């Protein structure tokens, strides 16, 4: 995390941590009955939460000690996002004290609800995301407060002041299911850049009227030292105009806005209609003879060439709804994808990445945007093979994870360390991606089967070279790869002996996801209700406060499903566990559940199209009476198709299911 922060700061990014000081969860290291009231439950998704005794927590100094611990672990963090706080109500002294603690450690404060932490918070989620949350909690509408603090905060009702605008939040990487980068780009440059330009200045004069629909029109003047800004709009049928020192920098929806970051001057241009427009340069850009126009894309800047200046004016030919920046070439730094990882551009996001970062041996592979707007490496039909040499981390045990999708077409991933090869193949992706916050999540219109594939390998002391190869056989369907990631491995769970396919105790804290499982179709595309639960006795265990299950069965970690909706809850996939055709396997695991006739183990051959495709194997009965762990064991035979998977089905009752020590063994040959 610290590396991410330090590298991100070079790109002018800021980083925060999401906290909750209203509720606490039993897994939290600071959780105890002194912190929370066990009789008052809060949000209940991955686990039940309990309301914190906020005043005692503040007065005791324990909360501040937790903040100081965070500061020690992430010294360059920029801000704290306070979730829930105030529960859509005011909280007086408690809010001021919370912010005092946050600010004293060099962080600024942001939060969820506009009507809490008003004095100190500079950004509210429910204000910034117009379509999220309640319609009556959308920010401050006070003209007096905005007059005083417009340059300090993004906490306003952003749709009632066309003069000043408002910073609007738009997701494109999976939050609330959104993946449209074009919408994000549109709101950034059409709405947010003009808003932020005005926030570089303080309001000095406010002469407006309020229309019948609540919209504010007229003239607002702003200043920052000698720099003077005026924004005007007469009514809803008139264009907005912004001038800087009497030079028009925005007219209607088009603009050429001056910007200065770290001493470097540039000009942002946006014209929703496109075409040719002429603009006067502000004083800082006048006299510069080496200005270039750059198109801004999600793969970096595209140099459109030098732009001529005549009488301190520039004429720009722009595409509609396309952002540009005018700057001197020596102020443009190249973008590097994959900093701090063994890979160059592990997500295929760089322009010309195949040419620059990979060796292409054969095939029709290319990087393209998929239906969700994500750049992926895609092979259409031909036999395809690409390879990248990697920067080896220190000697040790590692796992390569990458997103993979293929259909009736063999895909092979090979890690080569020195002279040793580690290979994994998959012929068919049978499980759609139901993780809402994953940009690769599925939809009815655009089914997505991208799921993690894992290859375990070791780096010996004398290793000097390493590579990763992605290969696809010839076929009639599209195969995709994306998001390569190498993590250090703490356990050996795959093929520890000749008969054992996997022995997963979930104790590897470096591991990614729920391996070898993925979220099934239960609940549809949503934030999952399944996670790896960490032991924190007695609070996570059977008996405390009426707990009917232990969240951790053995060791420090177990897999927990909490109140999951009806359907296929968990399943393996062929790229993680391959049940070979006609071979006999024994599947076993330990479990607890408070549900009787709620959870069922079984198999699926291919994709689950309807519930009848799930074939129950064995029983999972309640352990709630005594809290004693039970053991499941069953034999299954791999289908001739090679597409057999194992999973857990639920009827959807508000019950929990805990799994540990998941093991698959294959019958030995006699």
Tell me what each language-model feature is.
Residues 1-26:
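Aromatic- and glycine-enriched glycan-recognition loops and surfaces
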Residues 37-42, 46-47, 57-78, 85-338, ...:
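Active-site-proximal substrate-binding groove within the catalytic cores of carbohydrate-active enzymes
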Residues 348, 384-413, 453-459, 468, ...:
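Extra-cytoplasmic beta-strand recognition segments
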Residues 348-380, 510-558:
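Extracellular glycan-recognition surfaces and repeat-rich motifs
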Residues 379-393, 422, 433-436, 539-543, ...:
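Secreted extracellular polysaccharide-interacting domains
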Residues 408-419, 516-517, 570-572, 595-607, ...:
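Beta-strand acidic-aromatic groove motif in beta-rich domains, primarily in extracellular
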Residues 422-463, 609-643:
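Extracellular carbohydrate recognition and processing domains
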Residues 445-485, 506, 589, 602, ...:
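Extracellular beta-strand ligand-recognition surfaces/modules
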């Amino acid at each position: 995390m610290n590396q991410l922060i330090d590298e991100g700061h070079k790109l002018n990014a800021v980083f925060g941590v999401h906290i909750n000081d209203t509720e606490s969860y039993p897994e939290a290291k600071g959780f105890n009955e002194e912190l929370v009231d066990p009789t008052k439950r809060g949000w209940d998704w991955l686990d039940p939460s309990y309301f914190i005794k906020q005043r005692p927590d503040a007065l005791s100094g324990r909360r501040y000690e937790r903040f100081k611990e965070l500061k020690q672990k992430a010294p360059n963090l920029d801000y704290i996002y306070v979730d829930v706080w105030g529960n859509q109500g005011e909280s007086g002294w408690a809010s001021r004290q919370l912010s005092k603690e946050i600010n004293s450690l060099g962080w600024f404060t942001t939060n969820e609800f506009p009507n809490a932490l008003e004095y100190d918070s500079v950004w509210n989620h429910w204000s910034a995301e117009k379509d999220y949350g309640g319609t009556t909690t959308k920010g401050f509408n006070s003209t007096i407060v905005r007059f005083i603090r417009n340059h300090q905060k993004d906490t306003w009702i952003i749709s009632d002041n066309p003069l000043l605008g408002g910073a609007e939040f738009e997701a494109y990487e999976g939050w609330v299911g959104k993946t449209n980068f074009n919408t994000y780009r549109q709101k950034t440059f059409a709405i947010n850049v003009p808003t932020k330009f005005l926030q570089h200045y303080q309001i000095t004069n406010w002469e407006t009227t309020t229309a019948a629909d609540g919209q504010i029109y007229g003239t607002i003047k702003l200043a920052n030292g000698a720099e003077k800004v005026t924004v005007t709009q007469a009514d809803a049928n008139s264009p907005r105009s912004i001038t800087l020192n009497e030079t028009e920098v925005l007219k209607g929806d088009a603009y050429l806005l001056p910007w200065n970051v770290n001493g470097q001057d540039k000009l942002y241009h946006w014209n929703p209609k496109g075409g040719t427009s002429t603009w006067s340069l502000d004083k800082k850009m006048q006299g510069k003879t080496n200005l270039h126009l750059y198109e801004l894309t999600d793969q970096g800047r595209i140099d459109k060439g030098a732009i001529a200046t005549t009488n301190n004016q520039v004429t720009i030919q722009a595409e509609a709804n396309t952002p540009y920046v005018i700057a001197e070439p020596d102020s443009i730094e190249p973008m590097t994808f994959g900093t701090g990882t063994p890979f160059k551009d592990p997500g295929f996001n760089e322009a010309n990445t195949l040419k620059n970062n990979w060796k292409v041996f054969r095939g029709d592979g290319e990087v393209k945007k998929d239906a969700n707007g994500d750049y992926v490496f895609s092979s259409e039909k031909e036999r395809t093979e690409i390879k990248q040499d990697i920067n080896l981390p220190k000697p040790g045990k590692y796992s390569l994870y990458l997103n993979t999708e293929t259909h009736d077409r063999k895909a092979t991933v090979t890690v080569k360390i020195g002279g040793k090869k580690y290979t994994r193949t998959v012929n068919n992706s049978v499980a759609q991606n139901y993780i809402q916050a994953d940009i690769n999540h599925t939809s009815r219109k655009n089914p997505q089967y991208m799921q993690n594939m894992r290859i375990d390998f070791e780096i010996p002391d004398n290793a000097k070279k390493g590579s990763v190869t992605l290969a696809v056989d010839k076929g009639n369907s599209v195969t995709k790869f994306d998001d390569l990631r190498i993590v250090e491995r703490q356990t050996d769970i795959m093929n520890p002996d000749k008969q054992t396919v996997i022995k997963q105790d979930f104790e590897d804290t470096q591991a990614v996801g729920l391996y070898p499982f993925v979220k099934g179709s239960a609940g549809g595309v949503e934030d999952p209700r399944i996670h790896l639960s960490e032991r924190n006795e007695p609070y996570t265990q059977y008996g405390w406060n009426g707990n009917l299950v232990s969240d951790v069965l053995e060791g420090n970690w177990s897999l927990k499903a909490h109140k999951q909706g009806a359907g296929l809850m968990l399943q393996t996939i062929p790229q993680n566990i391959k049940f070979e055709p006609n071979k006999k396997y024994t599947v076993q695991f330990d479990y607890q559940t408070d549900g009787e006739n709620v959870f069922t183990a079984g198999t699926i051959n291919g994709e689950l199209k309807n519930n009848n495709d799930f074939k129950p194997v064995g029983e999972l009965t309640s352990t709630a009476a005594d809290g004693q762990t039970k053991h499941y064991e069953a034999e299954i035979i791999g289908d001739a198709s090679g597409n057999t998977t194992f999973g857990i089905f639920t009827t959807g009752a508000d019950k929990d299911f805990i799994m540990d020590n998941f093991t698959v063994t294959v019958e030995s040959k006699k």
